């Protein structure tokens, strides 16, 4: 068997990815398929941490939050990520994968608090760590949480799972001539105004020299191919 390209990775999942074809919430078939993909990577011996969004349940910047205090709306979004994290961990448990949910906000009866040395210990033991509640602060996205946690745990790369199979020169849904970049530098992405992550998350990854791989979570086997270092998605690097 070929050796994986990475030993420790941070996977960023959007909450919307859990919806499947449903208008909101968690689609069971979709989460089971995601867990199967994660299981394939875990079997390779790759240490895997996950940050998940909450947009399938609530978004602090969504129309439903209009008129609401932004900080309050963001806290509600953090709670949504805890719900998603619990669902993901439970789906993993049912197929024999040991996962630990660690929250940036204290909900100790439900999940344990995020403590960096403990998270590192879990990863070294071969457990999957799911980081919930974003950064624990309002006004920061879960993309920023992914960049932050990835930096903290010494991940070699942030894997940003999306609905498109990489970064394109233009919106592929609108422009038939849009081309996918196999690799692109952080500075090139900025100069071309390409939306990879929000500005705070992107700047943190660039400053920490933490590469980002953008790939499609809906494409079968894509996660494993990314971890094996194959030509899948777009690599954003220094």
From Swiss-Prot:
Top-level EC class: transferase
Lineage of source species: Bacteria, Pseudomonadati, Pseudomonadota, Betaproteobacteria, Burkholderiales
The species this protein was found in: Janthinobacterium sp. (strain Marseille) (Minibacterium massiliensis)
Protein name in UniProt: Uridylate kinase
Alphabetized SUPFAM superfamilies for the sequence: Carbamate kinase-like (SSF53633)
Transmembrane segments: none
Catalysed reactions, as listed in the record: UMP + ATP = UDP + ADP
Recorded GO MF terms: ATP binding; UMP kinase activity
Listed pathway(s): Pyrimidine metabolism; CTP biosynthesis via de novo pathway; UDP from UMP (UMPK route): step 1/1
Means of activity regulation: Inhibited by UTP.
Family annotation (InterPro entries): AceGlu_kinase-like_sf, Asp/Glu/Uridylate_kinase, Uridylate_kinase, Uridylate_kinase_bac
Biological process, per Gene Ontology: 'de novo' CTP biosynthetic process; UDP biosynthetic process
Pfam families (alphabetical): AA_kinase
């Amino acid at each position: 068997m070929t050796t994986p390209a990475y030993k420790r990775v941070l996977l960023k999942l959007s909450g919307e990815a859990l919806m499947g074809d449903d208008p909101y919430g968690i689609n069971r078939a979709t989460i089971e398929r995601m867990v199967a993909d994660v299981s394939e990577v875990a079997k390779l011996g790759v240490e895997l941490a996950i940050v998940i969004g909450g947009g399938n349940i609530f978004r602090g910047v969504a129309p439903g939050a209009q008129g609401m205090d932004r900080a309050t709306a963001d806290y509600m979004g953090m709670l949504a990520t805890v719900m998603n994290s619990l669902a993901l961990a439970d789906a993993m448990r049912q197929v024999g994968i040991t996962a630990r949910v660690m929250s940036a906000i204290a909900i100790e009866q439900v999940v344990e608090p995020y403590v960096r040395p403990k998270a590192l210990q879990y990863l070294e033991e071969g457990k999957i760590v799911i980081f919930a509640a974003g950064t624990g602060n309002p006004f920061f996205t879960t993309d920023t949480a992914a960049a932050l946690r990835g930096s903290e745990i010494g991940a070699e790369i942030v894997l940003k799972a999306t609905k498109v199979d990489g970064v394109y020169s233009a919106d592929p849904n609108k422009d038939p001539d849009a081309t996918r970049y196999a690799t692109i530098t952080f500075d090139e992405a900025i100069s071309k105004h390409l939306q990879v992550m929000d500005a705070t998350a992107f700047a943190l990854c660039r400053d920490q020299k933490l590469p980002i791989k953008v790939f499609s979570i809906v494409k079968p086997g894509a996660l494993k191919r990314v971890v094996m270092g194959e030509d899948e998605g777009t690599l954003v690097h220094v």
